[in-house]
Design a protein with these regions (language model features):
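Active-site bordering "gate/hinge" segments
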Residues: 1-324, 329-332, 426-428, 442, ...
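Dual-mode signal for accessory low-complexity, basic/Gly-rich regions
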Residues: 239, 275-493
């Protein structure tokens, strides 16, 4: 939250920018003043190996002139520099017109004057560095108590972010937001018989304060994590070249959702804006409303209002309020992730509010919001608890956590690993496996889900390292979901 004097100064600069943009005859313009504070701690074995605590500030000006975008940014927040950046953005827009194929048009948005602050109980930056470092070293010390049994490495981390943003537009919006983010976890590695295997645990990346760093929970999982790493290093390798039933915990499934549902439904990607870098999408607009993306009992919902969600905000970087909507409803592709530009091109009347820029020096683009798998309804014919899925499986594999992954340029054909694997036989877990991967075609995979967990097993998992764009931008989002069971999935090579 900006101080009163700083806010007034920033508002005065914003007013100056908007006046200049209007005077230049632009169809649209906006300005973002941003301050980011990032604090990261890493501990390796018995020492603190990495500590950063830095802050950066600046502003970015975006103009739309005769259907072409122009953008300029600077860290110097003075009237003189602001005037220079507005003029530069206008000149860039004029240059952009020279290679423009079709003019950019935007769907309308109301003007908002509002303030949004992430609800937190404890400011993470109010906690002394020493206390945070001691927590990490305590975790590592306890993991390394299993050194005689074979634990050789311990790593732990804490990460905190605070983002202050003031947005103003030629449409009359003036929005101030303060976002807090917290994240923690650890990993240990066991070594035996010429092999090394790891297990990990995390408090997932969420928009919360230091209250999210539940020390009791973090410390209570240490024994289990260490023992599973030791069991895993001695475990047999997983099967290869077969088909199997998979039961995926939310800690594994969220990444599959991210890669095979999130990215394919980014409308800028569908339209080819990413084709020279990350690729395109199989989920083309001619299939909207007809593509059988998943089984009829599968619903994928976006929700930027989700409490504590990593992508939860008040407004996106175009001043569009947060909202919720389905991208897949009863298995059918029904919508996309849009900003104001792509929504207009699709013929929609409004944006879904997915515009995000990771810095004052970055252009907003369509990013995945909080996007999750809805739980199965109570009493539903395909609803089952994790325990019921296991008990009802004659032979299969249970997967927890994330590992290696790959997916093709159209998000059609993928391969995923995991962090923990257990063999299931006759409805019981009989032991761990290691080095398991599964691969499938996206729509085949989601149509072969025959059981989904209830709301009581819904879990918020997600990522804080989603890369997109050139230059590369990093975004974060939550993929809350429940366990699922999937039939006839290819395992290994």
């Amino acid at each position: 939250m900006l101080t009163t004097s700083t806010r007034q100064k920033t508002c005065d600069l914003a007013t100056l920018a908007i006046d200049l943009i209007d005077q230049a005859g632009c169809e649209y313009g906006d300005i973002r003043f941003c301050t980011y504070r990032n604090q990261t701690l890493h501990a390796h074995d018995h020492s603190l190996s990495h500590l950063t605590d830095h802050q950066k500030s600046g502003f970015g000006v975006r103009v739309l002139l005769k259907g072409a975008w122009g953008f300029a940014a600077s860290y110097r927040q003075t009237p003189e520099e602001l005037i220079r950046m507005v003029n530069l953005a206008i000149e860039i827009a004029k240059g952009s017109r020279l290679c423009q194929q079709n003019p950019v048009r935007l769907v309308p948005v109301k003007a908002y004057q509002d303030t949004y602050i992430t609800p937190i109980k404890i400011d993470p930056f109010s906690i002394p560095i020493s206390e945070k470092a001691n927590l990490l070293l305590t975790i590592n010390d306890r993991l390394l108590q299993y050194q005689e049994q074979g634990i050789r490495k311990a790593n732990s981390y804490l990460q905190f972010n605070q983002e202050n943003k003031l947005f103003a537009s030629t449409e009359g919006s003036l929005i101030e937001q303060t976002i807090y983010r917290s994240y923690s976890g650890y990993r240990c590695t066991a070594v035996a018989n010429g092999d090394a295997q790891s297990r990990s645990y995390e408090r997932p990346p969420l928009n919360l304060g230091y209250e999210h760093i539940d020390q009791t929970d973090l410390l209570s999982q240490i024994e289990r994590v260490a023992e599973e790493a030791l069991e895993k290093v001695y475990a047999p390798k997983g099967p290869s070249g077969i088909q199997s039933t998979l039961i995926l915990k939310p800690t594994n499934l969220y990444l599959t959702i991210h890669e095979s549902v999130g990215h394919p439904t980014e409308l800028d990607r569908v339209y080819g804006y990413e084709s020279n870098f990350a690729g395109t999408s199989f989920a083309t607009t001619d299939q909207l409303g007809t593509l059988q993306y998943a089984a009829p009992w599968i619903n994928f919902k976006c929700d930027r209002t989700q409490p504590a969600g990593r992508s939860t905000i008040g407004y996106d970087d175009e001043g569009v309020p947060s909202q919720e909507w389905y991208v897949v409803k009863e298995g059918i592709l029904v919508d996309y992730l849009t900003d104001r530009e792509t929504a207009y091109r699709l013929g929609k009347s409004s944006s879904k509010g997915c515009a995000f820029a990771d810095s004052w020096s970055s252009l907003p683009m369509v990013r995945i919001p909080n996007l999750g798998l809805e739980p199965g309804p109570i009493g539903g014919s395909h609803t089952a608890t994790l325990a019921e899925m296991i008990a009802d499986t004659k032979e299969g594999i249970l997967i927890d956590g994330i590992g290696s992954f790959s997916i093709d340029q159209q998000r059609r054909n993928f391969q995923f690993g995991g962090d923990g694997f257990w063999q299931i036989k006759n409805g019981k877990i009989v032991g761990m496996l290691k080095d398991v991967t599964y691969h499938a075609m996206t729509t085949d995979f989601w149509n072969q889900v025959d059981a989904i967990g209830p709301a009581s097993e819904w879990q918020q998992c997600g990522t804080n390292m989603c890369g997109k764009g050139e230059p590369l931008q990093i975004a974060q989002m939550t993929h809350a979901c429940v366990p699922v069971r999937v039939q006839n999935i290819n395992i290994g090579g």
